[in-house]
Amino acid sequence: MNNKHPKNKAKSTTTPKTIALNKRARHEYHLIERHEAGLELQGWEVKAIRAGRANLGDGYAYVRDGEIFLIGAQITPLIQASTHVVANDRRTRKLLLHRHQIDTLIGRVQREGFTLVPTAMYWSKNRVKMEIALAKGKQAHDKRHAEKEREWQRDKQRIMRAHNRNA
């Protein structure tokens, strides 16, 4: 009896697979609120993303004509990308959100002076999604304070590990 679908088979989890992270965003901004957005991509961009050629380091989102666009994020084209299409690796890409989300984000950016920063790009159900965050820029003293806090947390962990080993 060859059973193709065993009952005790572990169910697959639908955890999103991370493509790219913007680690610099946490260092340079206070991240207030996060939102998931789709991306309007061309075919060569999806192939390049599958090959792991995305970089969010210099990216940010801006508002134009009631829509939100991503600028500065780099998707490096593959060598075998189509020859009849000019591949611009830093082109402006439209972010896909619901109208009420767009209105909320636009209001907070214009009234309260927030910035929209991409923090992560990942796969969700075979679609590329981007996590964007409402953010406020950090001052130099904020960055120093955050670095001191991280160092203290590392030292604390080191001390606890040494103490637990000796106990």
Swiss-Prot record:
Residues 139-167 are annotated as: Disordered. It comes from the Bacteria. GO terms for cellular component: cytosol. It is found in: Cytoplasm. Its main location: cytoplasm. Disulfide bonds: none annotated. Keywords: Cytoplasm, RNA-binding. One of its GO terms (molecular function) is RNA binding. Gene3D superfamilies: 2.40.280.10. Residues 144-158 have a biased composition (Basic and acidic residues). The keyword Cytoplasm applies. One of its GO terms (biological process) is trans-translation. InterPro entries: SmpB, SsrA-bd_prot, SsrA-bd_prot_CS. Belongs to the SmpB family. Required for rescue of stalled ribosomes mediated by trans-translation. Binds to transfer-messenger RNA (tmRNA), required for stable association of tmRNA with ribosomes. tmRNA and SmpB together mimic tRNA shape, replacing the anticodon stem-loop with SmpB. tmRNA is encoded by the ssrA gene; the 2 termini fold to resemble tRNA(Ala) and it encodes a 'tag peptide', a short internal open reading frame. During trans-translation Ala-aminoacylated tmRNA acts like a tRNA, entering the A-site of stalled ribosomes, displacing the stalled mRNA. This is SsrA-binding protein. It comes from Xylella fastidiosa (strain Temecula1 / ATCC 700964).
